[in-house]
Amino acid sequence: MKMLRDPLFWLIALFVALIFWLPYSQPLFAALFPQLPRPVYQQESFAALALAHFWLVGISSLFAVIIGTGAGIAVTRPWGAEFRPLVETIAAVGQTFPPVAVLAIAVPVIGFGLQPAIIALILYGVLPVLQATLAGLGAIDASVTEVAKGMGMSRGQRVRKVELPLAAPVILAGVRTSVIINIGTATIASTVGASTLGTPIIIGLSGFNTAYVIQGALLVALAAIIADRLFERLVQALSQHAK
């Protein structure tokens, strides 16, 4: 009964219901858009598009987390502090560089498909994770690390057992931002041949089919909201655990 009162449960249920209902929604969209000969996207199943979309976001976000967290840890060490401005600048440039431009540059070199899309999403996903890692590690009281040092912990042990657990809620908030950005940005990966929930949107825009755009946009928006709520729960759980 508690699950039935959870908004997150109903959001997930709505997403799954839309995935399986949209292929049979022709009467509704035909009534809304009578001028369209094919008002429902049927080239691929929405379930397959959703799985491909989540896989692309998951892989790119994983690399973004590894790179962003690793770089954040490195430049907060004494031996890497001088590289902090450079790392922050590179990450900021990657965030401001349009993903469409990244795809346009990568396609002639790598070809069509997932690879250029993954590169673009990694560039977009690194900055929030890096900034959160720097903020989380920077907020740790120096006395805490000194106590850990006095207990005989090595540098690696202090990072793994003290600093990262304390900074985890802040880092996870950055990961949350990164993943949500990538869920939306992954839609343009369909322009280079990757199957995502953006495929109906891109085809709809190019073919002036508003119904396709609505169908894809509904699923992408719901996926972003669900991811946001899931990470909100994780951040709350980690914050309570840290206390």
UniProtKB/Swiss-Prot annotation:
UniProt KW Transport keyword: yes
Segments forming domain ABC transmembrane type-1: 50-231
Segments on the Periplasmic side according to the record's topology features: 30-46, 123, 183-206
Membrane topology type: Multi-pass membrane protein
Subcellular location field: Cell inner membrane
Induction: Expression is sigma S-dependent. Induced by both osmotic shock and entry into stationary phase.
Sequence ranges on the Cytoplasmic membrane side: 1-8, 68-101, 145-161, 228-243
Protein name: Glycine betaine uptake system permease protein YehW
Record lineage: Bacteria, Pseudomonadati, Pseudomonadota, Gammaproteobacteria, Enterobacterales
